[in-house]
């Protein structure tokens, strides 16, 4: 996938895919991710997260054994169903993605971002393959499903999408925690660096997994998202 005249150059197709992927999963892409903490706000108030070390432990678990892995599996399955034009399979994945969200606020978080992502991406990067995939999903669309079908429509390599998606996910979690703990910029980047060895294998597991492999072992994080709904003072919507 490189230019034959320069072994270090990107092919035109790969350069376009990389450009789109970096744009879609950039913090500046307007899906409203900054407004959500995925329950971290309650975890900070409860004392579960109080510094960079405890944040790293919490996010490592969320990535490998919780929302990160599950979202990765859903993204991959939606991507494959959309690529194959399997509308029934895509609808089943989309329905499951919304049904398995553990709390009302997390459901709002993923469906609001999913709707924003697919609307903006489809207007800025139109594709004849997108409208049928959107229609197949039915009503509400979870964020990883939206990323999966848009990436499939533009033939962005799935492995790269998964890695970039999980990096964006954990980056947003860290951004929220930095405002809540609070953490300085250097500590925030140390946490991101510490999670690098977690992102890659989680993406690889999600790539190889089926829907039967979905499951979470982060009950405390799920409980945090539930308890956030009645938290008295809040900065975030989840």
Curated annotation (Swiss-Prot):
Its main location: cytoplasm. This is Urease accessory protein UreF. The gene is ureF. The lineage of its organism: Bacteria, Pseudomonadati, Pseudomonadota, Alphaproteobacteria, Hyphomicrobiales. UreD, UreF and UreG form a complex that acts as a GTP-hydrolysis-dependent molecular chaperone, activating the urease apoprotein by helping to assemble the nickel containing metallocenter of UreC. The UreE protein probably delivers the nickel. Belongs to the UreF family. One of its GO terms (molecular function) is nickel cation binding. The keyword Cell membrane does not apply. PANTHER family: UREASE ACCESSORY PROTEIN F. Keywords: Chaperone, Cytoplasm, Nickel insertion. GO terms for cellular component: cytoplasm. It is found in: Cytoplasm. Pfam families: UreF.
């Amino acid at each position: 996938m490189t230019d034959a005249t320069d072994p270090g150059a990107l092919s035109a197709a790969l350069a376009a895919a990389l450009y789109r992927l970096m744009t879609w999963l950039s913090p500046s892409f307007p899906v409203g991710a900054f407004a959500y903490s995925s329950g971290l706000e309650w975890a900070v108030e409860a004392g579960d997260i109080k510094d960079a070390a405890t944040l790293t432990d919490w996010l490592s678990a969320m990535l490998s054994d919780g929302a990160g892995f599950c979202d990765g599996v859903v993204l991959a399955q939606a991507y494959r169903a959309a690529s194959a034009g399997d509308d029934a399979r895509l609808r089943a994945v989309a329905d499951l993605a919304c049904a398995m969200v553990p709390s009302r606020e997390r459901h709002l978080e993923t469906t609001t971002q999913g709707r924003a992502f697919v609307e903006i991406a489809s207007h800025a990067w139109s594709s004849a393959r997108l409208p049928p995939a959107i229609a197949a999903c039915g009503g509400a669309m979870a964020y990883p499903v939206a990323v999966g079908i848009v990436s499939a429509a533009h033939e962005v390599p799935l492995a790269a999408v998964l890695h970039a998606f999980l990096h964006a996910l954990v980056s947003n979690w860290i951004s929220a925690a930095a405002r809540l703990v609070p953490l300085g910029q250097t500590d925030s980047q140390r946490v991101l660096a510490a999670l690098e060895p977690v992102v890659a294998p989680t993406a690889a597991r999600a790539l190889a997994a089926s829907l039967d492999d979905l499951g979470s072992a982060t009950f405390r994080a799920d409980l945090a998202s539930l308890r956030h709904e009645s938290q008295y003072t809040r900065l975030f919507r989840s």
